[in-house]
Amino acid sequence: MSNAITMGIFWHLIGAASAACFYAPFKKVKKWSWETMWSVGGIVSWIILPWAISALLLPNFWAYYSSFSLSTRLPVFLFGAMWGIGNINYGLTMRYLGMSMGIGIAIGITLIVGTLMTPIINGNFDVLISTEGGRMTLLGVLVALIGVGIVTRAGQLKERKMGIKAEEFNLKKGLVLAVMCGIFSAGMSFAMNAAKPMHEAAAALGVDPLYVALPSYVVIMGGGAIINLGFCFIRLAKVKDLSLKADFSLAKSLIIHNVLLSTLGGLMWYLQFFFYAWGHARIPAQYDYISWMLHMSFYVLCGGIVGLVLKEWNNAGRRPVTVLSLGCVVIIVAANIVGIGMAN
């Protein structure tokens, strides 16, 4: 396995670790509605950071974006909005299926759809099947899916042991939302694929290869921001028990506390895709679809590890932890299989 591929896998791991940890600061926010908290973090992660970093990277910010036709920018934006819909459905999936089943089904579907649809759309899926390296990477995707399934099973065992239940369990509604979440969340993978002309243009301007994907986040995350912020603002305006004014009428020290924590959560959310861009840049072009598989499977891996570190599994008993450990090992094996396949 070449050093470039190894570093690509490593940066995807770092990005996934940030994704697995980003919600921790949000949990410490006090006396704010979820909608206010999510909006503040979202403004940081989807608007401020993408714009600020792109302004630093690009020699002429406005000239860069105006150089693309609407036919180039619109698919990138719409796929970003598609991801935004999946992001909202994610929370509803947890509500009706519970954490373990919800995450397992949603992540499993988005892993398959986001990984395999890209080469199908690009018309080179047959090349993957017909080459040894391609078949090896596809095997890695299958093994990763098995690993996600095992971790999901561990979560179910944990919830059963600890008596944790879904907020409003509804299998039919939850499964529909999980499938929708999985499909729509893959919009981020499709957006990255559609944004290749933007990446190439950034490279032509002298932007370092590790950073060429970052300017496209202004458009991608702009699409996601409109969906997420629109959802939050509509609820803040229409739901009687929610009030943006009330949330910002608290003691000044508490407002600062909440803003700082929400900002930190937003920063950590953004960092997952900052390092995703670094990892993506190191993956061979013919296997760039693998970036999504690495990110999603490592997200599940890191989520399990973070849960162990935070002692969330302490009262779950030995069997769930053993199953979780097995699932994590399978995901690591999957990453190695994919790495070997790309090296071939």
From Swiss-Prot:
Biophysicochemical property: pH dependence: Optimum pH is 7 for L-rhamnose transport.
GO BP annotations listed: rhamnose transmembrane transport
Cystine crosslinks: none
Domain of life: Bacteria
Cytoplasmic side: 25-37, 95-100, 158-174, 235-258, 311-322
InterPro entries the record matches: L-rhamnose-proton_sym_RhaT
A Pfam family annotated for this UniProt entry: RhaT
Intervals, Periplasmic compartment: 1-3, 59-73, 122-136, 196-213, 280-289, 344
Compartments, as annotated in UniProt: Cell inner membrane
Function: Uptake of L-rhamnose across the cytoplasmic membrane with the concomitant transport of protons into the cell (symport system). Can also transport L-mannose and L-lyxose, but at reduced rates.
Name of the featured protein: L-rhamnose-proton symporter
Organism: Escherichia coli (strain K12)
